[in-house]
């Protein structure tokens, strides 16, 4: 793809799909700075391909573990498997489309693709951030308000909540599908007309400002603010619990407190990864939306934009590996899946892991949860 094609717009006309244009040229397009090297258009899709492959391996393995290992089917893990499903959907649909813009000078996926791809990606982003919010709420209830937990039909209720998250995410993405279209754009300075998949016409500078700000608030600021409030109360409760615990307290109680801390930290790591990976993409889109009439063809802007896009998609492949590092039981199951074709190693893994299964705080024999008495309250413990 000729980088000059995108130089006419100072923003990715779709915050999740960079501009893919079909030109009707009457004059030579304005050239970007001399820094651009043609090899970049092959390196970037290769990086996309690496992200897709790694993400597929991690998320498919994670979903397979939660579907086939009965002891892993609990409240937090059900949310995490829903999160993995959303990431998987993003990687197999939107990531290849995003990579294709560097290899083609035109939009390859027609009008239907122009409406469907933004819808899928916004749905996936919604599933990710709203599931993280639900996970934070679950940790808040388990740690701060354990008396509110009801053991009966816990998994069924969580399944309904996960389904509701998908429905809400799809409803919020409907405007993206309705208004996204192959819009003709005309550049007065060069007398060029091109077709681009965009969520709004090019005629009004207010459209990108509204679109970028709404996306930033609904899919980033508001959910992360809610999560921050939850974690403030979680941290405060854990600190108070540590102070109130007797010096020679019950060993089981101490283990339960440590389990709660690990679970809260796991969810917090997921939240931190999402915030870190998606913030640059939102910031760049806001910058472009509020500098709509200007054109930035600098190397810094180009590299920053590419890195922001790659970082956003990287978020869809890192969660399984973060869970691998944080959870002993998931690490064991992940190794079991990878070593399934090596019986001797698999048997050795089972024999060494069986003695520690009952001690790890990330695995439960109860499909929904376990309950214990801590500081006079019934405490709900989920596992990852």
Curated annotation (Swiss-Prot):
A lipid is attached at residue 340 (S-palmitoyl cysteine). It is a multi-pass membrane protein. Disulfide bonds join 114-197. GO terms for molecular function: bombesin receptor activity; G protein-coupled peptide receptor activity; G protein-coupled receptor activity; neuropeptide binding; neuropeptide receptor activity. GO terms for cellular component: plasma membrane. The keyword Glycoprotein applies. Expressed in the hippocampal CA1 region (at protein level). Residues 64-77, 138-153, 236-265, 327-384 are cytoplasmic. It holds the Pfam family 7tm_1. The chain crosses the membrane at residues 40-63, 78-97, 116-137, 154-175, 210-235, 266-286, 300-326. The modification Phosphoserine is found at residue 351. It is found in: Cell membrane. GO terms for biological process: G protein-coupled receptor signaling pathway; learning or memory; motor behavior; phospholipase C-activating G protein-coupled receptor signaling pathway; positive regulation of behavioral fear response; positive regulation of respiratory gaseous exchange; psychomotor behavior; regulation of cell population proliferation. InterPro entries: Bombsn_rcpt-like, Gastrin_pep_rcpt, GPCR_Rhodpsn, GPCR_Rhodpsn_7TM. Keywords: Cell membrane, Disulfide bond, G-protein coupled receptor, Glycoprotein, Lipoprotein, Membrane, Palmitate, Phosphoprotein, Receptor, Transducer, Transmembrane, Transmembrane helix. Glycans are attached at residues 5, 20, 24. Residues 1-39, 98-115, 176-209, 287-299 are extracellular. Belongs to the G-protein coupled receptor 1 family. Receptor for gastrin-releasing peptide (GRP). Signals via association with G proteins that activate a phosphatidylinositol-calcium second messenger system, resulting in Akt phosphorylation. Contributes to the regulation of food intake. Contributes to the perception of prurient stimuli and transmission of itch signals in the spinal cord that promote scratching behavior, but does not play a role in the perception of pain. Contributes primarily to nonhistaminergic itch sensation. This is Gastrin-releasing peptide receptor. It comes from Rattus norvegicus (Rat). The lineage of its organism: Eukaryota, Metazoa, Chordata, Craniata, Vertebrata.
């Amino acid at each position: 793809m000729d980088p000059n094609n995108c130089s006419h717009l100072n923003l990715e006309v779709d915050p999740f799909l960079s501009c893919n244009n079909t030109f009707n040229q009457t004059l030579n397009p304005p050239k970007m700075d001399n820094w651009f090297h043609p090899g970049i258009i092959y390196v970037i899709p290769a990086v996309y391909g690496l992200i897709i492959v790694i993400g597929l391996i991690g998320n498919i393995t994670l979903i397979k573990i939660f579907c086939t290992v009965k002891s892993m089917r609990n409240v937090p893990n059900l949310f995490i498997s829903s999160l993995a499903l959303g990431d998987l959907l993003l990687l197999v649909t939107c990531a290849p489309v995003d990579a294709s813009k560097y290899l083609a000078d035109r939009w390859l996926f027609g009008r239907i693709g122009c409406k469907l791809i933004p819808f899928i990606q916004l749905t996936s982003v919604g599933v990710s951030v709203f599931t993280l919010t639900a996970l934070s709420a679950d940790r808040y209830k388990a740690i701060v308000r354990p008396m509110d937990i009801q053991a009966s039909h816990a998994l069924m209720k969580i399944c309904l909540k996960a389904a509701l998250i998908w429905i809400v995410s799809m409803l919020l993405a409907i405007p993206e599908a309705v208004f996204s279209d192959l819009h003709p754009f005309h550049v007065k300075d060069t007398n060029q007309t091109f077709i681009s998949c965009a969520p709004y016409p090019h005629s009004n500078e207010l459209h990108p400002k509204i679109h970028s700000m709404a996306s930033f608030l609904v899919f980033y600021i508001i959910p992360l603010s809610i999560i921050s409030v939850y974690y403030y109360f979680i941290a405060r409760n854990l600190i108070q619990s540590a102070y109130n615990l007797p010096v020679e307290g019950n060993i089981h109680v101490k283990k339960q407190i440590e389990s709660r801390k690990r679970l809260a930290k796991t969810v917090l790591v997921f939240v931190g990864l999402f915030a870190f990976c998606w913030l640059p993409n939102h910031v760049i889109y806001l910058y472009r939306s509020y500098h709509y009439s200007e054109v930035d063809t600098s190397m810094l802007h180009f590299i920053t934009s590419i890195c922001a896009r790659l970082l956003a998609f990287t978020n869809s492949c890192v969660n399984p590996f973060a869970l691998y590092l944080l959870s002993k039981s998931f690490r064991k199951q992940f190794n079991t899946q990878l070593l399934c074709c090596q019986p001797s190693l698999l048997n050795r893994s089972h024999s060494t892991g069986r003695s520690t299964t009952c001690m790890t705080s990330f695995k439960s024999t109860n499909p929904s949860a376990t309950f214990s008495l801590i500081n006079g309250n019934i405490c709900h413990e989920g596992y990852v």
